[in-house]
A protein has these predicted regions:
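Mid-to-C-terminal alpha-helical segments outside catalytic/metal-binding sites
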Residues: 1-11, 16-59, 88-95, 118-122, ...
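Divalent metal-dependent hydrolysis catalytic cores, especially in the metallo-beta-lactamase
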Residues: 32-41, 47-74, 101-109, 130-134
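Catalytic pocket-lining loop regions of alpha/beta-barrel enzymes
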Residues: 124-288
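Aromatic- and glycine-enriched glycan-recognition loops and surfaces
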Residues: 38-46, 84, 88, 141-152
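A short acidic, glycine-rich active-site loop
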Residues: 33-42, 80-81, 186-195, 243-246, ...
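Short glycine-enriched loops at secondary-structure junctions
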Residues: 15, 65, 110, 166-172, ...
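Surface-exposed, active-site-proximal loop segments in enzymatic domains
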Residues: 66-80, 114, 183-184
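Short, electropositive alpha-helical surface patch
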Residues: 64, 77-80, 116-128, 217, ...
Length: 338
C-alpha cells in the first residue's frame, strides 16, 4: 500500500563505502566474501538507489556495516586509517547525494580510544556527522568499561547520539561443550541478547545518570527489553528488597526509568505487534524508522522496507505519532536541517 507519510528517514541504514570496500576486499578477503560480496547495494550506489526509488520519500542516515567490528580484524593503528577512510567517503556520499543521504554516523577505531575520541571530534566538527557508531561489545569488553568514559563525556557534550549495533560472532558458542554457535543462533537470537546486555551495563553502571545528556540508539527495537518489562520490574525490585541485589542501589531512578531513556529503531522486519510492544514501553517519541537495509533480506531491503513501512502504518496509534516515527524523531534526535 502507498504510505500517506511522504518523508521517511531511515535512521539506521547500512553501507560499505566503495573505496572502503575495495580495501576490505584486498586486505580482508574472508570478511568480504562472507558478507559484502553477497550484498551489492552495500557498495553499489545505482543498485541501492533502484531499491530506494521503489519507496518514495525514503532517505537514509548512513552507518557502516555489516562486517565484524572494525576492532575485531584491524589492529589499533590500521583501524584508525580504516575509520578515517570510511568516514571521509561517507561524507563525500552525503555531499554528492543530498536527496538520498541526509546524514552519516561515524565509524570509530574503538581499540584505540585516544584516536576514537579524536575521530569523533573530526567527524562531527569537520565532516558534519550526526553521531557515532559502536558495537555492543568491544573486543570482549563491556560498554561500561572505564576506558570508554571519555567518549561518552564527549558525546554528551555534543548532544548527539551513540548508535549501538549488536555483535556476537559464530565463535561464541551457546554451550561450553561446543566451540562454535550453530543454526545462526548467534545472530538471530544472540544479537537481541547482546543489545539487552549492553543496555543493562549502561543502566546499572550509572553512565546514563553520570551523563544525563547522553542519547543512545539501539538497533532491532531495543532487543529484549520491552518484552521483559515486567520481569525487569519484578526481579530487580524483589532482589533489592531481599538484599540480594548485585547492582548499585544508590542510583536515584528505578532501573526501568533508565531503560526508557534509550531510543530504538524499528528494524524487526515488519512485526506490528512487536512495534506496539515497543511503543507501549518507550512511546512514539523514542522510536525511529529503520529497516536494516539492505541486510536481513534476500531482496536487499526491498522486502524489509515494504514490511516495515506497512507495519508502522498498521500500528494503532495516531497519525501524528506515526509521523514522529517516520521522520520527526530523527530530525530532532540528529538535529537534521531537512
Amino acid at each position: 500500500m502507498e504510505s500517506q507519510y511522504f518523508l521517511k528517514i531511515d535512521a539506521y541504514a547500512h553501507i560499505s563505502p566503495p573505496k572502503y570496500t575495495d580495501v576490505l576486499r584486498k586486505e580482508y578477503p574472508g570478511f568480504y566474501n562472507q558478507i559484502l560480496g553477497t550484498c551489492p547495494p552495500l557498495f553499489d550506489m545505482p543498485e541501492r538507489f533502484r531499491i530506494m526509488d521503489l519507496y518514495p520519500g525514503v532517505v537514509q542516515v548512513l552507518t557502516v556495516g555489516p562486517v565484524p567490528p572494525l576492532e575485531a580484524f584491524a589492529d589499533p593503528e590500521k583501524s584508525v586509517d580504516l575509520a578515517k577512510l570510511a568516514n571521509d567517503e561517507m561524507a563525500e556520499l552525503v555531499a554528492k547525494y543530498r536527496d538520498r543521504f541526509v546524514a552519516a554516523i561515524a565509524l570509530l577505531p574503538m581499540n584505540n580510544m585516544d584516536a576514537a575520541v579524536e575521530e569523533a571530534k573530526r567527524a562531527i566538527k569537520d565532516l558534519g556527522f550526526r553521531g557515532i557508531y559502536v558495537h555492543s561489545t568491544i573486543n570482549g569488553k563491556p560498554l561500561d568499561s572505564p576506558e570508554f568514559l571519555p567518549l561518552y563525556e564527549r558525546m554528551s557534550q555534543y548532544n548527539l547520539p551513540i548508535y549501538i549495533h549488536p555483535w556476537r560472532g559464530d565463535d561464541v558458542a551457546e554451550y561450553p561443550t561446543e566451540k562454535t554457535s550453530k543454526y545462526m543462533i548467534a545472530s538471530v537470537f544472540g544479537w537481541p541478547y547482546e543489545t539487552t546486555a549492553a543496555m543493562t551495563r549502561l543502566v546499572f553502571s550509572g553512565i546514563l545518570e553520570k551523563y544525563p545528556n547522553l542519547k543512545v540508539v539501539t538497533h532491532h527495537c531495543g532487543g529484549m527489553v520491552p518484552y521483559y518489562e515486567q520481569r525487569i520490574l519484578q526481579h530487580y525490585g524483589s532482589h533489592e528488597r531481599s538484599g540480594r541485589a548485585s547492582y548499585p542501589k544508590d542510583l536515584p531512578k528505578s532501573p526501568i526509568e533508565y531503560y526508557k531513556m534509550f531510543y530504538n529503531d524499528t528494524a524487526i522486519h515488519g512485526n506490528t505487534p512487536a512495534l506496539m510492544l515497543a511503543y507501549h514501553f518507550w512511546g512514539a517519541d523514542h522510536m525511529v524508522f529503520g529497516a536494516d537495509m539492505p541486510l536481513g533480506d534476500h531482496y536487499f531491503g526491498f522486502r524489509s522496507y515494504r514490511q516495515t513501512i506497512n507495519a508502522i502504518e498498521a500500528m494503532d496509534i495516531t497519525g501524528a505519532e506515526k509521523k514522529k516515527i517516520f521522520a520527526d524523531n530523527a530530525l530532532r534526535l540528529l538535529r537534521l536541517p531537512v
